[in-house]
Regions:
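Multi-bladed beta-propeller domains
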Residues: 196-216, 242-258, 288-304
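Residue-level detector of Asp-centered blade-edge/turn motifs that repeat once per structural unit
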Residues: 171-173, 222-223, 266-267, 312-313
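Short beta-strand->alpha-helix linker/helix-N-cap micro-motif
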Residues: 35-99, 112
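C-terminal/domain-edge helix-coil "capping" segments
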Residues: 30-44, 133-205
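A flexible loop/linker signature enriched in serine peptidases of the S9 family
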Residues: 170, 182-192, 210-213, 230-239, ...
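Amphipathic beta-strand/beta-sheet edge segments enriched in Tyr/Trp
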Residues: 32-33, 94-159
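Hydrophobic beta-strand positions that form the internal "hydrophobic ladder"
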Residues: 177, 227, 268-271, 314-318
């Protein structure tokens, strides 16, 4: 019994030593934990001076332009605007060379200056963009608009120019969003086709339909001048095209069955869509030329074919 007890203690001792070795002896095969953190992008500081005006209304217009440009660039996450209180030079820098050292002191990497005038019944705007550390002008543009209602659009265009010149990528500020607006109680929802600028500003919001009929699936044409969407009129779904220039709505076609999921071709000259045959209830894909209104059936099989879309080159349909 004593011998067995001694052997038992000895075995336990070896067992505990083995456990300790497993936990404390470094292994050449131990797992290597590597933590990769996301790179941090610091926003680029840009100074945007007041847009000087030659009258009360142009001064106000300049304030609107400056606010739009500043908000656009800041909201992109790639820029931040230097605080006005830090500005050392406050002159109109469109017609004179900036004192670049003054802008270096406040750590502005880029400087945007502009002015706005009302001449010959139109607003004329000039801008100059400077690279502060290089000490040189990198962009100069002159633009005009017929009325103040287009100031927001002009501000977005200037934002695009600045963004593209500095980043090398195309801007997206002069774009709009088409969507379905919903209001009212859950059992009586009113849905209207609506459009707004990409920044969602209330001044840019506009309803395109009156809400009497249900509207669905709006899509921009690549030319950004027309919208295709589906509307239930007299409980019948039809595809319509809305012209943003003149506000005219026209029906694409009065088809016998349900029509839905319209998409434009890259050149905005055709639409591909699907509609169902009321006799068979089968859904097929059709192609329509918007100039001639001719229709070609693309599919013919017992399955349900729907939600077509063009490839970027317009040669294929998925």
């Amino acid at each position: 019994m004593n011998v067995c007890y001694f052997r038992s203690l000895k075995m336990k001792k070896y067992y505990y030593l083995t456990i300790l070795l497993i936990f404390f002896v470094p292994s050449s095969y131990a797992a290597l934990d590597v933590t990769i953190s996301q790179g941090k992008v610091e926003p680029t500081p840009i100074a945007i001076t007041n847009f000087f005006g030659n009258s009360d209304k142009t001064v106000k217009g300049g304030e609107v332009l400056r606010e739009i440009i500043s908000n656009n660039l800041t909201n992109s996450g790639l820029f931040y605007t230097v605080d006005d209180d830090l500005y050392i030079q406050s002159d109109n820098l469109v017609d004179k060379v900036p004192r670049f050292e003054d802008w270096k002191i406040i750590k502005a990497q880029f400087l945007l200056s502009g002015d706005i005038k009302f001449i010959d019944n139109k607003y004329s705007v000039r801008i100059r963009l400077y690279d502060v550390f290089a000490g040189q002008e990198i962009k100069a543009v002159k633009m005009s608009i017929p009325n103040k209602d287009l100031l927001r659009r002009l501000g977005h265009k200037i934002s695009d120019l600045v963004y593209e010149r500095i980043t090398g990528e195309g801007g997206y500020f002069d774009t709009r969003i088409v969507y379905i607006s919903e209001v009212g109680p859950l059992n009586q929802r009113v849905k209207r086709l609506a459009i707004m600028d990409q920044d969602g500003h209330s001044d840019s919001h506009q309803f395109l339909t009156n809400g009497k009929n249900l509207v669905l699936t709006p899509r921009f044409a690549p030319n950004n001048q027309t919208i295709t969407y589906m509307e239930y009129e007299n409980n019948t779904p039809r595809v319509y095209i809305y012209n943003l220039k003149n506000g005219v709505r026209e029906i694409v076609g009065d088809f016998p069955g349900m029509t839905f999921a319209p998409r434009f071709s890259p050149d905005s000259q055709k639409i591909v869509m699907s509609f169902s045959d009321p006799k068979t209830a089968n859904t097929e894909i059709y192609l329509m030329d918007l100039n001639t209104r001719t229709i070609n059936r693309l599919t013919n099989d017992p399955g349900i074919d729907t939600s077509p879309s063009f490839s970027p080159d317009g040669k294929k349909i998925v």
